[in-house]
A protein has these predicted regions:
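Helix-to-loop junction immediately C-terminal to a conserved catalytic motif
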Residues: 68
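Catalytic Walker B motif of ABC-type/P-loop ATPase nucleotide-binding domains
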Residues: 176-180
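Q-loop/switch helix immediately C-terminal to the Walker
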Residues: 103, 109-126, 133
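Conserved ABC ATPase signature
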Residues: 151-155, 159
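Conserved structural motif at the start of ABC-family nucleotide-binding domains
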Residues: 22, 36-39
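Conserved ABC transporter NBD signature motif
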Residues: 76-84, 93
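Conserved ABC ATPase "signature" region
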Residues: 129-147
Length: 233
């Protein structure tokens, strides 16, 4: 038995360009000699906000990790802005695609040191830390500037996730891959992060994201299309 992709798509908004920012073509993933999904094809257009839904075990996280270049696939290809992803193109691709998960991994030090540290990575060395942008984001989150001086070791789970979001969004990715990023957070913090992502997309409306969540109310608020992973005979 194979898990195949069933796609429920609404008509994409008229203002969106005709060219997809990301194309998934006949993608397949095998785990323990079993196809988790196969013949998986869909497109992501600039400005889209897409929910990835499906039962537990349908491979939602595996899909996002594969799209981020973190996990292998056994069939098909991923095309970003017309360029097929391969080992040569991967560093450039990873500078444009950022994966956020439920439990972030942070470096030791203060919040601001975490935000600055990412610019030392090879794929982001061409960028410059923008403190004003971070302060604008903190204002949206109802956080004061002294939050930047907090030691990471003293942060709550919700505050750590805020740092992870800030660290990702400041890099101005073309696509965000959000894997249950607010699942363990209280409603207020979750909705603040939703607003932060909305502000990030408003800055450049061609940005797009894929978001997984077990909360249908959240997905109704933050997405305009669904991709559904279902098991098929």
């Amino acid at each position: 038995m194979k898990d195949r992709l069933t796609i429920n798509q609404t008509t994409k908004p008229e203002l969106l360009p005709n060219n997809p920012i990301l194309s998934v073509q006949d993608l397949g993933r095998i785990v323990e000699q079993r196809w988790i999904w196969s013949h998986l094809s869909f497109q992501l257009f600039p400005g889209e906000r897409v929910a990835v839904i499906g039962a537990s075990g349908s491979g939602k996280s595996l899909l996002l990790r594969a799209l981020a270049g973190l996990d292998p696939v056994q069939a098909g290809q991923i095309v970003f802005q017309g360029q097929a992803i391969n080992s040569h193109f991967m560093p450039s691709y990873r500078s444009q695609i950022i994966y956020l998960q439920q439990r972030p991994a942070l470096w030791e030090g203060t919040v601001e040191e975490n935000l600055q540290q990412v610019y030392r990575l090879a794929v982001h060395r061409h960028l410059i830390y923008n403190r004003k942008l971070i302060l604008d984001y903190l204002l949206l989150l109802h956080k004061t500037p002294d939050f930047l001086q907090r030691p990471v070791s003293a942060l709550s789970g919700g505050e750590a996730q805020i740092v992870a979001f800030l660290r990702a969004l400041q890099l101005s990715p073309a696509i965000l891959l959000l894997d249950e990023p607010t699942a363990s957070l209280d409603t207020g913090t979750a909705q603040s992060l939703e607003a932060l992502v909305a502000a990030w997309q408003y800055e450049r409306p061609q940005r797009a994201y894929l978001w997984t969540s077990h909360d249908p109310n959240q997905l109704e608020r933050i997405t305009n299309r669904q991709i559904t992973l279902k098991e098929k005979d």
